[in-house]
């Protein structure tokens, strides 16, 4: 009996150094910790907080997030995120009975037309927004389509939904916006709503709420709203809609 106890104790002592030799106490903890790639981890968290609407009203992204944001925007993840959001919008729409007055509302900038070509020249959001420079870029009318939104747009049209574009662009951009939309493949819409410069609203959220109220008064039924900003999606007069938030970690519009 003593010999057996001694044998068990010896086995335990021999096995002890081996047990846990490759074991991670916190297997879900990032290996980077606070090392050289910590900015990548931090910026992924920043991006998540922006999309979850926990970080708001930021004027610029953190300086250390320029490269991670660039990698995200130009990599596969941004396209995949956009695809997933648009797919969910289509799945939702395809389950509904479509009426003649049913509309989907889309934003324009970085919702249907990509402004990434502008932001890649301005630090992916690390520079404060310059309205003059941005207007010059818009006036060129060369913004490409966001491909996953274009796919969804065509699918929604095929289901029988009417499309309304609702943007904070001013009315003086109507001609260039119409031309750019058509050039990018968005050929059909029920209404294109741009902002009257004489209309005073405290922010984009209030403006878009007011425009949705006008649409409801015209007899439309708002089924879905798709945008890259929370101000596209929140507020009053959303009708019966579900909202779908597209990714945009570069800037915030209140």
UniProtKB/Swiss-Prot annotation:
Q: Which UniProt keyword terms apply here?
A: Glycoprotein, Seed storage protein, Signal, Storage protein
Q: Which residues form the propeptide?
A: 21-35
Range of residues in the leader sequence: 1-20
One Gene Ontology MF term: nutrient reservoir activity
Q: Which Gene3D superfamilies match?
A: HAD superfamily/HAD-like
**Tissue spec:** Accumulates in the stems of developing soybean seedlings.
Q: Which residues are glycosylated?
A: 130
Indicate the family of this protein. Answer: Belongs to the APS1/VSP family.
NCBIfam families for the chain? Veg_Stor_Prot (TIGR01680)
Function, please? May function as somatic storage protein during early seedling development.
What protein name does the entry list? Stem 31 kDa glycoprotein
Q: Which organism is it from?
A: Glycine max (Soybean)
The encoding gene: VSPB
């Amino acid at each position: 009996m003593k010999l057996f106890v001694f044998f068990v104790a010896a086995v335990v002592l021999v096995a002890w150094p081996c047990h846990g030799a490759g074991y991670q106490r916190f297997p879900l903890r990032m290996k980077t910790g606070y090392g050289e790639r910590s900015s990548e981890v931090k910026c992924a968290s920043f991006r998540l907080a922006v999309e979850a609407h926990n970080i708001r009203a930021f004027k610029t992204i953190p300086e250390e997030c320029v490269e991670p944001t660039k990698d995200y925007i130009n990599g596969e993840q941004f396209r995949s995120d956009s695809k997933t959001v648009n797919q969910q919008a289509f799945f939702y729409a395809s389950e509904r009975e479509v009426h003649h007055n049913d509309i989907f509302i889309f934003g324009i900038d970085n919702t249907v037309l990509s402004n990434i070509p502008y932001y890649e020249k301005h630090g992916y959001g690390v520079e404060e927004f310059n309205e003059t420079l941005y207007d010059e870029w818009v006036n060129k009318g060369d913004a490409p389509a966001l491909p996953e939104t274009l796919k969804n747009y065509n699918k929604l049209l095929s289901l029988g939904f009417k499309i309304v574009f609702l943007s904070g662009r001013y009315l003086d951009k109507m001609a260039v916006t119409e031309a750019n939309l058509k050039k990018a493949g968005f050929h059909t819409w029920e209404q294109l709503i741009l902002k009257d410069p004489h209309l005073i609203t405290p922010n984009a959220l209030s403006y878009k709420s007011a425009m949705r109220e006008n649409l409801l008064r015209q007899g439309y039924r708002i089924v879905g709203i798709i945008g890259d900003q929370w101000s596209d999606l929140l507020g009053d007069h959303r009708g019966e809609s579900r909202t779908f938030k597209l990714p945009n970690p570069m800037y915030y519009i209140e």
